Amino acid sequence: MENFAEQCLDMARSILSQNLDAIEDNGTISPFPNEVTTGQESGHAAFAIGEYFRATNEDTLDGHNLFDLAARTITAQAFSPESHEGGLAFASLGLLSFGSAKDRNPIWERLLEPTRLQLDEQLLERNDYNNHYQAFNIGKSVARYSVGLSKKDETGKLIDRFLERIEENSSSGYFDDVDSTTNKLSGTFDIYGVSSFVFIRQALQLHANINLRERKLASLRTKAEKYLKLIPDMVRQDGTGWSYGRSIGAYGQMCSISIILQAMRDGWISKTQADLYQDTVKKLFLNFFITYLNQEHGYLVIRDDERNTDPSYTNRIANFDAARYLCQWSRLIRSIGNNYPSENTPKPRKIGRFINFDKSSKKEQGLFVYQDPNSGLSFQLPLVAPNKDHIDSCDYLAFPHAPGIFDWPINKYMPIMIPELTFGDKTIIPAYYGKNCTTKVGMRNTLQFSYEQPTLITKEGVFANGIGSCKVNWAFAGGKINCEYVFKVESQIQLNRIRYSIAISAPHSTYRIGTSFTLGEEGHRAEVLKDDFQAQWKQTETVSQDPNYRTHNGKIHYIQTLERDHPLIMRKGIEYRLALSFEPDITFADA
């Protein structure tokens, strides 16, 4: 583990060395070529510099005075023309990383009086959030009290409110990144649950009141442990981790590693599970290291000609965040020491289960995870709602998310592996929620997952009352998948169009792990078993040169679409079925 800690610190040093020159004299950050700043880069830089100082106690790096750079970036974030809760929260914890009392904090000493007053005012101002922004409120509160800007500590109250919202929004105790839109379906259970717990735990570690930290850790543990139990089942043999929702890719890897290492440091993981979690961290890290790090120059790449990511993240933000995480991992690993000795490498497990995130009279939401070591088929099938800013994407659609095998374009909507039905101005998809979600073992040990939608829902996440209903049945046997969709309408209605798309991608030409899964020459081996809509396969569309068809890991080259583009009168009482099967030819990227 000591060697791992040093490796993390060396990587952090390399990444920071490549990015500190981007900090301007006024503390703003110059972007990578072909990117624009988001206004939060300075805060992320400040926190990364602070974490590096905590890990090394060094105040210079490659001739840069880290104290001056931290002061500059914190000042820039404090006076950012637009309000950025995240950037401010990161900047405030960056300040706190250099010392919890302002009279002993070298960065506070360097801040001019207008900056101090601005920080005091901004850290006091906060809105009440139901989503992951509440974690930023907690970070700001920790900084304000610990630095000594306030004698009243609101951190405990804010953490209690964060946990209460989890109870209100999830019957199973998972974090719903609720947005302010009230007319759409809630239930955005994604990686922001993990990242929120990681951020809050990191903030508490910097809190001046150790007693408060210990009191609140017990409350946080009851919820965070749910993700700790989930993550090992999500990680593929090639190390690919969280694979659905927004902001995954490198962040899916980094957040998953962080929450596991934090839990090991805090003793939340049983010693009997040391082999499982050590193996999980190793796989996640190796995938992260090879897939996202430029080995020659030592910096992170999350967006280029072949891959893409969430528009709220830039390569510059990702580099500072990666440096911060690596410094954090180095400290955590040293703190863990030999408390979790690993004796054996666990054998690959066969996994097939549905994790229920929320169940009420109105909806059920969750995640079906599947791994078959013999065939290499591994995927995550989400039944969750999209965040309002990600409605026009495939990130939350209910299909088997399996990077390299069943892929989808980032920041672009299309009906990947689900039927899309258009009735007038309403576009219907069987995603986002279900009722009567069940898993069972059928004939010949076939694992089945099914759910119903008594009310159809639009791709925007709004219930389409009065049109009809849908039943969805998935069946899995080794490396083979069958899916069936059964639609019924409440009264005669005209269907304008139905379409169903499949994406064929390739791994990144440079940044890829040789053992990552990808499609072989025989592709998906897709077959239409039943089609009451009488749709036809369109000519395969070549999209290799279109920048809108990039994934987190590589480029999509072809789109195959099954479509009926002329009207069909659907009649009450008749079931309309669409059934397909897949048996993907899975191989290694460098086979």
What do these predicted ranges mean?
Residues 237, 241, 252-538:
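Extended polysaccharide-engagement surfaces of secreted carbohydrate-active enzymes
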Residues 9, 13, 17-20, 50, ...:
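Residue-level detector of alpha-helical secondary structure
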Residues 1-65:
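Low-complexity, Ser/Thr/Pro/Gly-enriched N-terminal "stalk/linker" regions
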Residues 534-591:
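Beta-strand-rich recognition/accessory modules
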Residues 110-351:
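Extracellular polysaccharide-recognition and catalytic grooves
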Residues 31-34, 78-79, 126-128, 184-185:
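Short, recurring structural edge motifs at helix starts
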Residues 34-56, 81-101, 130-148, 190-194, ...:
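An alpha-helical repeat/solenoid feature that recognizes helix-turn-helix modules
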Residues 64-125:
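Well-ordered mid-protein domain cores that form the structural environment of catalytic cofactors
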